[in-house]
């Protein structure tokens, strides 16, 4: 019999985890296999100055699917493409970007994609599963029927 799915609820006002970094904070709640993040960035916050020293990557490697609650955020991709997001905007931001707060108002974002490992030192993140991917690439032997 299939397992019955049930509704779930959590609040970002009582997060599972809080990560604090220079001029910013991330509140996380996970349920149903999804990690929701509420990021708050203060005026003067810039990813390459506030988070890069923690994660030790050249660009933000997290993909984001975001709803922008307040403030203005400018994002530049590694190829030089730029876009600015403000209240009410939704956005998809691929890996390899930098971002910063525009103006004097804090930025608040709800992210449903890229916050699970955001602002987490590289050593604290799980290793990529190369062995598992290689195993999947091998052809499977056919089972013999008896």
Language-model regions, residue ranges each:
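A short, N-terminal "cap"/entry segment at the start of jelly-roll beta-barrel domains
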Residues: 1-40, 48, 124, 142-146
């Amino acid at each position: 019999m299939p397992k019955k799915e049930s509704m779930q609820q959590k609040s970002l006002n009582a997060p599972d985890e809080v990560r604090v970094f220079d001029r910013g904070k991330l509140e996380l709640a996970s349920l149903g296999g999804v990690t929701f993040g509420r990021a708050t960035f203060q005026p003067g916050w810039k990813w390459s100055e506030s988070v890069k020293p923690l994660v030790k990557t050249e660009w933000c490697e997290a993909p984001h699917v975001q709803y922008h609650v307040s403030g203005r955020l400018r994002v530049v991709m590694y190829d030089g493409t730029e876009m600015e997001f403000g209240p009410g905007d939704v956005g998809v931001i691929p890996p390899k970007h930098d971002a910063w707060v525009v103006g004097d108002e804090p930025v608040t974002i709800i992210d449903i994609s890229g916050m699970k490992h955001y602002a987490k030192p590289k050593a604290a993140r799980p290793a990529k599963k190369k062995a598992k991917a290689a195993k999947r690439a091998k052809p499977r032997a056919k089972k013999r029927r008896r």
